């Protein structure tokens, strides 16, 4: 299992406050049954927050998470 660092995520979303919000929204989606957008190892028992951060670091999730629910 590769470790995820905040620095990896900050390369994608430079503002740490926006990063926190985007990862939180995505983690909530995953908790509610959302499908992960990255490939997961079936042996890893990563929490939704870790999966969300991995998605941000991989570029699969970004600032579009902050626009959820807005028309």
From Swiss-Prot:
Pfam families: RNA_pol_Rpb6 (PF01192). One of its GO terms (biological process) is DNA-templated transcription. It catalyses: RNA(n) + a ribonucleoside 5'-triphosphate = RNA(n+1) + diphosphate. It comes from the Bacteria. Its EC number is 2.7.7.6. The keyword Membrane does not apply. Gene3D superfamilies: 3.90.940.10. Signal peptide: none annotated. Keywords: DNA-directed RNA polymerase, Nucleotidyltransferase, Transcription, Transferase. InterPro entries: DNA-dir_RNA_pol_omega, Pol_omega/Rpo6/RPB6, RPB6/omega-like_sf. GO terms for cellular component: DNA-directed RNA polymerase complex. The keyword NADP does not apply. It is an enzyme of class 2 (transferase). GO terms for molecular function: DNA binding; DNA-directed RNA polymerase activity. Promotes RNA polymerase assembly. Latches the N- and C-terminal regions of the beta' subunit thereby facilitating its interaction with the beta and alpha subunits. The RNAP catalytic core consists of 2 alpha, 1 beta, 1 beta' and 1 omega subunit. When a sigma factor is associated with the core the holoenzyme is formed, which can initiate transcription. Belongs to the RNA polymerase subunit omega family. PANTHER family: DNA-DIRECTED RNA POLYMERASE SUBUNIT OMEGA. HAMAP family: RNApol_bact_RpoZ. This is DNA-directed RNA polymerase subunit omega.
């Amino acid at each position: 299992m590769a470790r995820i660092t905040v620095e990896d995520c900050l390369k994608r979303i430079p503002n740490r406050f926006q990063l926190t919000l985007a990862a939180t929204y995505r983690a909530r989606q995953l908790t509610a049954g959302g499908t992960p957008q990255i490939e997961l190892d079936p042996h890893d028992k990563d929490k939704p927050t870790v999966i969300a951060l991995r998605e941000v670091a991989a570029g699969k999730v970004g600032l579009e998470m902050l626009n959820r629910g807005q028309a």
